[in-house]
């Protein structure tokens, strides 16, 4: 009986050992089996009790080895939201010149290079856009994140102080970028009204703007060339511009020479009046009536040709009796300060085009002869790639018939015949009936499906 009991205990120990369960369960299982075994002698129980008493260090009743599942349950129960420690961001510092962030070690290398770059770019700007050199904010005596944040805020404000507002839209830019922006920034038509100097509320608004933001100095228009200059630059520019105007005016033909432009009187309302003399110097073209500067008119007349008209139109003026009489002035007035007033509206004649009989597109009279051989060669290549049932016969060029006694082609009839020839190559789709070029019909038929009758 004792041997059987020992075998049973040894098998229990092996099974618990292989299952990797807590070790204290083995003793409980053994004790549980001993408590229910009525046939074991009392001496054996006493001996086991002595073994437990004699070896108290080997058995650790206070420690428990937990499995992975039980440990997760206990941790989730005791700590439902474990604390998350964020990774500490390194202390970045803001450059007081450009406003970008750099590491504490990199900032000492960056600032001298950034200041040198700032000086180079500032020296390239016009004088009225140049800014004073930015000053580095004083270091803060405190320590910790508060002093770092205050230093970065002061550096950022120093970099933002260099921005200049656009006079048109009010947005702020760096001085070198403001010039680029002003090329494309145009004032809105329905913008706010311009403040007049007579109203007290407008004067108060101007004082607020001038006290808050440093605006770009106003520009004045040159009465000779019409360009804008600063108030200090204009007195230097005007004598040079007038000298240049005299040289160019002397080179012109006599009928195009203009009188010396007179400087307008200074007015409080200022700038719009300066453009008056510049507009008065413009000369109109006798062919198209457009106005140009005198030196630009000969350049324009090289390409501007009078519109061909059939019968010569006589210059008719109203007589005293209400009838029409022919003008007695044989010479056309070429030196006109304003365009002539005519009852007929200006008609811009489109250059004549010819339709290609192969592709149906329009080309100029010179380009069509270059295009047609290339288009026909391309047509042959594409036609050979088609299936045999979709190949078309070669398109024929329509006959060109000249009108008797005039010697030029009837372009309308020629284009109509070429368009008909190009349209005859289209093939209808057998499903929807739409017409396509043969190479496009194959692509269309992949997605064309018959409509399902309702």
Curated annotation (Swiss-Prot):
Residues 48-85, 125-146, 256-282, 299-345 are annotated as: Disordered. A zinc finger (C2HC/C3H-type) spans 91-120, 162-191, 218-247, 281-310, 352-381, 425-454. Residues 66-79 have a biased composition (Polar residues). Zn(2+) 5 binds at residues 356, 359, 371, 375. Zn(2+) 6 binds at residues 429, 432, 444, 448. Zn(2+) 2 binds at residues 166, 169, 181, 185. InterPro entries: ZC2HC1A/B-like (IPR026319), Znf_C2HC_C3H (IPR049899). Keywords: Metal-binding, Repeat, Zinc, Zinc-finger. One of its GO terms (molecular function) is zinc ion binding. Zn(2+) 3 binds at residues 222, 225, 237, 241. Pfam families: zf-C2HC_2. Zn(2+) 4 binds at residues 285, 288, 300, 304. Zn(2+) 1 binds at residues 95, 98, 110, 114. The keyword Transcription regulation does not apply. Its cofactor is Zn(2+). This is Zinc finger protein 474. It comes from Bos taurus (Bovine). The lineage of its organism: Eukaryota, Metazoa, Chordata, Craniata, Vertebrata.
